[in-house]
Structure formats: structure tokens, C-alpha cells
């Protein structure tokens, strides 16, 4: 599998249009996909000794990462830089991200962040990642105020329209096991714990 076959043909929201609706939807897909990818790929990542990052993931996972990369590459130059990150956070509703935060993110990479570097960074992070931490991090993206919960209706919409789509029945089963509170909030910390440990916290 060559890199060139992965660098073309992925469509994303048009940069510079000011229409953040599609970008929000697509970015959410990327984060949800990232939460799912460790579940499916972690054993392969931990067990591989290959230096070829593309061997860590199957084709569908690479495509998901490519879609996330394309969304974040706001200026479509093939690299993710500080301004791309700032625009992505703005699309998610975080408009006051500090320069220092953005610089720290960019500095995690060994050089300019093209798709291969982006994929390598995910591969490295997945090697020692705690699945509970990974899932929590994905939920925290939507919990911008750090309250520990997200709106159940929002999660339902994402589960049924993005990535590996849930059916109505699957969503009902999930909410039967993890019912939202009277305000319609879902305690995602407890949900993540049960997913990864198989039982509720005491």
C-alpha cells in the first residue's frame, strides 16, 4: 500500500467559506472515529515492530484518519500547522485557545505534520494508551466546560449519523443501560468506565 493512493480523493468542507456547520459534523466524525480506532487497532499497534506506519492500521482506519486530517488541514496545503489547529478549535466552539497550547501540539511532531507524520503520531500514542483514557478524551472534546456530561440527544445524533452508525434499537439499548438524567445529560465518565471495566464504579 503506497502513500500516494491515500493522499487524493478525500472530500471535506470548503476552507474559507465561513460555513462551520459541515466542519463541525465532520470533525465530530473524526473524533468519534479516533475513539473507535483504538478498540479495533490497538492489538495490531502494540504487536507490530514494523517501521511502516501504514501497516499498523487497515484500509478503513487509514481512510478515517485521512478524513480527520483533511478536516484539520484548513488551508489545504497538505500540512497541519498552528493556524489549522486554531481554525479547527474555533469550529468546535473554542475560540480562545492559547498560542502556547497550539505550539505545544505542533511541537509534538518531529517536523512538519503531513499525513504520514499525523498517522505516525496516532500510532505512537496508541501503543501505550489506556482504552478508558482514549474514550474519555473523545467525549471531553464535546464537553467544552468540563462538566463530566454531554447531552444525550447530541450523542444519539452522532451515533446514528457518523462513523459506524448505530441503529435506533442500538441507541435505545445503550440508553436503557446508561439512562440520561432528568435534564437529558449523559454521565460519560461512568459510561467509559463500564465500557472498559464491565461494571459500574462503586
Swiss-Prot record:
Entry comment describing in which tissues the protein is expressed: Specifically expressed in precursor B- and T-lymphocytes.
Residue ranges constituting the EF-hand domain according to the UniProt record: 60-95, 130-165, 166-201
InterPro entries: EF-hand-dom_pair (IPR011992), EF_Hand_1_Ca_BS (IPR018247), EF_hand_dom (IPR002048), Myosin_RLC (IPR050403)
Keyword annotations from UniProtKB, A to Z: Calcium, Metal-binding, Repeat
Keyword presence, Repeat: yes
Record: residues binding Ca(2+): 73, 75, 77, 84
GO cellular component term of the entry, any: mitochondrion
Miscellaneous notes: This chain binds calcium.
Quaternary structure annotation from Swiss-Prot or TrEMBL: Myosin is a hexamer of 2 heavy chains and 4 light chains.
PANTHER family named among the record's database cross-references: MYOSIN REGULATORY LIGHT CHAIN 2
UniProt name for this protein: Myosin regulatory light chain 10
Organism: Mus musculus (Mouse)
Gene: Myl10
